[in-house]
């Protein structure tokens, strides 16, 4: 039965309900307060559940060497992979299991893959995501594709890394629904095989820190997508792109290969895409107001976006209604689009840009009418579709056999791919 809920705004660690700050009781509990039904002697302190000093003698793991697909830069230990979380084989495998394991949610119905399914462009292809108890969020599920190269996470960039991002959904009341991280860790600690893997990978028991690092490792590697038709063309396979895709590429803002003799009669960068969608991953990792979600009648943004992630007292008016530039790689797979999922197709996305966005006080200054013809708009869409990776991993390839509980029960990872209530 669905819970009766009030409208709430989520901020990690607290709920804003009716304008009041509500701190869940479990978060207020002291380190010495026992879990309900347990004695103080049997209880592990919250600190030990979140982080534990490793015992190096237990670690039995190997480095994981990854060669990214064609068109993507190396996973540099300096710029992409944190020194505190090097890639290892055991960590990747552990992260793969945790990613698809619904036991990370309060009622065992939601896994990371519920909202970030590899076969759906690492999203859920829904306007906004559905979590525990069929509760619906307010934002579109952002893709995990190539987040290895990301400088910040979430639409508003409120988390600086995949490691910190992985911890948020666990305690989001409309996603995985856990009141605190301690309960998640305790639940995973009840799985014998996880305890064994954590000892080998980290030299610790199951901890939140280890869970986050394993999940981040899996996402960095498994969600890499390159070797698209564009990458093949860029590498010298001139016939990899059609004439329409080549015209779209030029309109997008990219020059043709120097050995290509095709001469498209279109204006370079007329669509202005490369003002934001730049680099190997086609994103500037910055925040822009496109007018999506502006309520003209109320003269306000339905979602304040980046501004909400900035510290109170340090909020920039220019950040109001601004959201992070997503990658265009695999965009053909990850619709609907924009932070609220309001644009169903890439054609609708082009229509929005072509008209110059939606006027509002914080509209990005580069958002102006493009005056693209229908053919030009179609060509840009064709090019974006040509950015679909051909080496991406499918859900079936990645779906693991999950370890059983103490009583031998094995959760259904495939069932958790379907959002609750659908």
Task: Annotate each predicted stretch with a short phrase.
Residues 2-3, 205-210, 260:
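Short amphipathic alpha-helical segments with coiled-coil-like heptad repeat character
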Residues 2-14:
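N-terminal Sec-pathway targeting helices
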Residues 34-168, 228-344, 348-354, 358-361, ...:
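Short glycine/threonine-rich turn/loop motifs
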Residues 148-151, 166-170, 188, 192, ...:
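Generic hydrophobic/packing signal
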Residues 173-178, 187:
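A gly/proline- and charged-residue-enriched helix-loop-helix capping module
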